[in-house]
Design a protein with these regions (language model features):
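Conserved AMP-binding/adenylate-forming
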Residues: 2-16, 20-121, 128-131, 144-145
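AMP-binding/adenylate-forming catalytic core of the ANL superfamily
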Residues: 85, 90-94, 113-182
């Protein structure tokens, strides 16, 4: 609805993604021909992705953080977003241990978990620290929040992990409903 409202008053939104460790935007959701003709909900799904490398970035990719191999471009296999290029910091001031850990394998590790779409666009699913592991399954707090936000009565929500004796963790949602909701 935000995208559609902005477009209705002549504002064209562009989604960019970056981190403190990367100077300026590191990736941009570069709009492709034909996106404007799609229904608003489909345009929003495409435009909310983190995109492709920004012109000054050497590479943005999604790698398996253990094997350092690129995940399949299937929009499903989760890996970690990693950067390489001249706009990535050289290291953390007076913290060589953190610098070494962040640059294992020659890539800057963001801590953001994502998929690589077939069209090579990156889509973040969650932060590695926020993944809920329940009975051996990885549950993205962001995906649960996205599902909750689609309900017309939901104004705001947050999903966190709750300890569980059987499953290890289970999702717990804090939901604020709209005033007019019953």
């Amino acid at each position: 609805k935000v995208l559609e409202g902005a477009e209705n008053i002549g504002i064209k939104l562009t989604h960019v993604y970056g981190l403190t460790e990367v100077s300026g935007p590191a990736s941009v959701c570069a709009e492709q021909p034909g996106w404007d003709e799609l229904p608003a909900d489909q345009r929003a799904q495409l435009k909310r992705r983190q995109g492709v490398p920004y012109p000054l970035e050497e590479a943005v990719t999604v790698l398996d953080p253990v094997t350092m191999q690129q995940v399949p471009r299937d929009g499903e296999t989760i890996g970690e977003v990693m950067f390489r290029g001249n706009i990535v910091m050289k290291g953390y001031l007076k913290n060589p241990k953190a610098t070494d850990k962040s640059f294992e394998g020659g890539w800057f590790h963001t801590g953001d978990l994502a998929v690589m779409e077939p069209d090579r666009y990156v889509k973040i699913k969650d932060r590695s620290k926020d993944i809920i592991i329940s009975g051996g399954e990885n549950i993205s707090s962001i995906e649960v929040e996205d599902a909750l936000y689609r309900h017309p009565a939901v104004l705001a929500c947050a999903v966190v992990a709750r300890p569980d004796p059987k499953w290890g963790e289970t999702p717990l949602a804090f939901v604020e409903t709209k005033a007019e909701a019953t």
